[in-house]
Amino acid sequence: MNRIVFVFACLNLFLFTLPLSAQNEEAKPPKRFFGFRSLKDTATNEKKGTFILPLIYYTPDIRWAGGVAGIYYFKLPAKKASEKETRVSNIQFLTDYTQNKQLDVWGQWNIFTRNEDYLLKGEFRYRDFPDRFYGIGNNSNLNQVEKYEYSLLSFKSLFLKQVKPSLFLGFDYHLEKQFGFKYTPQASLESGQIPGSRGGVQSAVGLVSLYDNRDNVINAYKGNLFELSSYFYLPAIGSTYRFTYINSLYQKYWQIKPKHIIALQARGRYGFGEVPFLDLSTLGNDDLLRGYPKNRFRDINFIGSQLEYRFPLFWRLGMVAFVGAGDVYRNTSDLSFQNIKYSLGTGIRFAVNPAERLNLRLDYGLGKEGGFFYFIVGESF
């Protein structure tokens, strides 16, 4: 298998900006460079806009695939003197289709209502894709991998009310159906002994508390984020399995000098009950612990953290360096310094909209078993 996925994006990027206030029809259009407004223009004029990125990529499992990713971002202005302008809200989407006739459609939203009285977050996904199962535990063998395919339909809807400055409390609902499994013959998943290997429905209610005083939710320069949530998957509301997850997330940002940022993230996920294998905590993705195959390790619990240094280069280009460590585990006795997974790497940033700090990122992460490239809209955290 090719360890580093070859990914490239069409360079004909499209940026459409839609000013909130009407402009003089006779005003001269802003000067552009390769389709992008000058830093001065984007720093003062753009309050909302849409960025669309065509994608083409190849992996051995799906062969060639093409699609489009994008983000729509906006702010709601204050209508009264007592109100404040909201931070940036955003709606993201991605869809791609493969040479093997597989489809992935994903959407996510993070919306502040006027005066930030409420925060609405959610996610929708339909996925019909191949995946890889390396076993359960933090010491699984990379070479003992099973290929499988499945379909997934998922919906999450989070409603939060601001009860004190920067403090939000609310509820979440998660509904997901996993079906249409196809396995490698004589694989461990095919036996049906692993919970969730025959599919099912996961239905949960969640209790969520969030403290967020970051200056920008897309790409913070300063501030803190702390989130604590509990999700209860119950047969009484349609869940095939009964289990619970408690999630913790902390992020801190320091601006040590203009546009030089140190960012810290710590994350934990702790499960109880009979957890289907697709809902287990995982290690290996495009944000925390970059440098491992997707979902390389799975188990009930996860704990990990990362540190990232972000700094400008010139024009719209910036650079980052990052390091992280973490692991999955069933019991605390499974954790050890010898088994802990580390990640380090670097990346390039291209500012699509400097005013709202919206970046394209190209990262290379290196882990214990090799490295991977990642090309994505937005920061890792």
Label each region the model flagged.
Residues L210, N216-L313, F322:
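C-terminal outer-membrane beta-barrel translocator/porin domains of Gram-negative envelope proteins
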